[in-house]
Each structure stands twice: as C-alpha cells, then as structure tokens.
C-alpha cells in the first residue's frame, strides 16, 4: 500500500519540489530512492472554504488535506474524481460535517489513513469503510453517541486497524454480531477515552492489543468485563472519577497484559493483591494519583514480571536484583526487590545492587 511504501522509503532520502496545482492549493512532490525513481504527491487544500470541493487533483496524488474548510457534507461525488481513487491518506478534520453518506468512500480503494476528527458527526453508516484498506481511522472530537463495531469492517485483508473514538458522547458500543457474514474488524488499537460509557463494552473477538477507557464515568468493573481480550497488552483506566474499587481477579482474562494504567483515580481504594491475580506478564503499573499504595513485596508476589510502578506523586519504583556481598550458592535465586524514590532518583539508579 502507498502509505506503507511511503514509510519504508523515508530512510532512502527525500527531495521535495512544488508542482502546478489548483488555485489556492499547494502540491508538493516527494521523490525517493535511487535516481528519484519513486514519487508521491501531497496536496494541501486546507482553510480555503467550502467552495473548494470537488477540487481537481493530480492523478498521482497520495495524500489530500481538506481540513478546516467548513465542509458540511461529504459524498461520493466529492471524492470520486480523477486522482481520488489512488489516495492513501485523506484529512477531513476540523470541518462542519454532521453526517457522511454510506458510499462516501466507496471509490477510495487504496485509502489507508482517514482523519474525520473535530467535526459534528452524530452517527456512522453501516459498512461505510468496507471498500478501503484502512489502517488508521480518527473520529475523535465528534458527537457520536452510539457506535456499532461492525461499522469498522474494512477491506484490510487482515492488516491492523487503529481507531480513535476519544472525546465523543458515546454511551453505548454495540458488539460485533456473532453470526455476521463478514469477518470481525481487525481493530488492534481502540481509544474510547473521555466518552460516557458506564460499563466496559463487549469487545470480545476483536484482536485488541491497546485499549483506553480513560475519563469515562465507569462506576464499577464487573467480573468478566474483559472476556475475549486475551491478546491485550496495554490497558489504560486512568481518570475514572466514579470508580471506588476493583474486583478480585478482575483482570484474569488478560494473561498477556504488559502495561496497566490506573492513574488519576483518587477514590480508588486498595482491595487486596488478588486484584492483579493472573497478570504474570505485567511489566509496568501506574498507580499515581490514586489511593492505592500496596506493599512492594505483595506486588512482586502477584506480578513476577513487574519492572516499574508509579505511586503517589512523582514516586517511581523499579525492580532491582540484589546480588549481595557474596556469590550465590548454586541453585539459589537472587533477591528481587522494588526500590522506590522520586522520578529523577529512579531514572539514575542502578538495576543491580
């Protein structure tokens, strides 16, 4: 795909030249490789006003910026002219879009990156992205209230998909139908922070590796809330102002979790080390800005792979291996402890004592 190739060629050197362009727009040609054998066109038509669409663009355009144009609607006729079918990146952010038609992107068969952030979108048509091999969709800062996971079914052929739904009004996320004709969306990164979710949504069967629920009004995290997310490696539950306690074994469905962020939860109380039961691969734990101050020995017992913990205000604890003054006896294990100090001290402290 064009975006992937673009990133691979960055290391080979870039030469930028200006090309003739539609009045008001800027067209830059970036050439790569030996003897400038490959080129991409980036067209910037931002901040010109709604009259700019549909705008003619060069046939070999890879990225089009239509941001900040006060656009109120986007449909197939706006995005269907010559040069649009090979687009790899499209920026429609900071407009006045309140809706998009189901076929708006149907001709963009090579589109990988789509930015619809900072608009007024209240709903997503079903299967609106199915024609494009998208790998990155930014829908942050809109007015979405109810979103169906099936809306993110793309023509990606198994490639990872990153979806940003942060800063919306989402109170309900509809799970993917178990008997759907199309395969489940390949969402690996999902940002749901700062919405209106009162419970952890059902995300089972998604190949998630990153999930953020920061800033939602979650009142509790029920047992089994993360069922079906065994591949998750990074979970952020920061700034959940309403949550008071975590259930014992609440994360046991996440055996592959490596990073857990529980920072900024001032009402969250310690409920025992059983909360972290089953997190045998967890390496980073952030408890800063919360009332959780567990004993280091307790954490290491339940989290054998733990490398660092943030607690209180600017206190960082790091995993240390104490070798002692004498050589260990054959078969004995070194003593592992958590050494805590301010962030600067932890940054320069040794790993082995």
From Swiss-Prot:
InterPro entries: Dev_Immune_Receptor, Leu-rich_rpt, Leu-rich_rpt_typical-subtyp, LRR_dom_sf
One Pfam family it belongs to: LRR_8
Other observations noted: This factor is named 'Tsukushi' because its expression pattern in chick embryos is similar to the shape of the Japanese horsetail plant, tsukushi.
Induction statement: Early induced by insulin independently of glucose and by 17-beta-estradiol in liver.
Entry annotated with the keyword Cell cycle: no
Species, as recorded: Rattus norvegicus
Domain LRRNT: residue ranges: 18-59
UniProt keyword Ubl conjugation, yes or no: no
Glycosylation site positions: 75, 138, 191
Location within or outside the cell: Secreted
A GO biological process held by the record: cholesterol efflux
Leader peptide range in chain numbering: 1-17
Subunit relationships: Interacts with FZD4 (via FZ domain); competes with WNT2B for binding to FZD4, inhibiting Wnt signaling and repressing peripheral eye development. Interacts with TGFB1; the interaction contributes to regulation of the hair cycle. Interacts with netrin. Interacts with CCN2.
Function of the molecule: Contributes to various developmental events and other processes such as wound healing and cholesterol homeostasis through its interactions with multiple signaling pathways. Wnt signaling inhibitor which competes with WNT2B for binding to Wnt receptor FZD4 and represses WNT2B-dependent development of the peripheral eye. Plays a role in regulating the hair cycle by controlling TGFB1 signaling. Required for the development of the anterior commissure in the brain by inhibiting neurite outgrowth. Essential for terminal differentiation of hippocampal neural stem cells.
LRR repeat residues: 60-80, 86-107, 110-131, 133-154, 160-180, 186-207, 208-228, 231-253, 256-277, 281-302
Tissue specificity remark: Expressed at high levels in the liver, small intestine and placenta. Not or barely detectable in other tissues, including whole pancreas, adipose tissues, skeletal muscle, kidney, spleen, brain, lung and testis.
Protein name, entry field: Tsukushi
One MF term in the entry's GO annotations: transforming growth factor beta binding
Keywords: Developmental protein, Glycoprotein, Leucine-rich repeat, Neurogenesis, Repeat, Secreted, Signal
A single Gene Ontology CC term: extracellular matrix
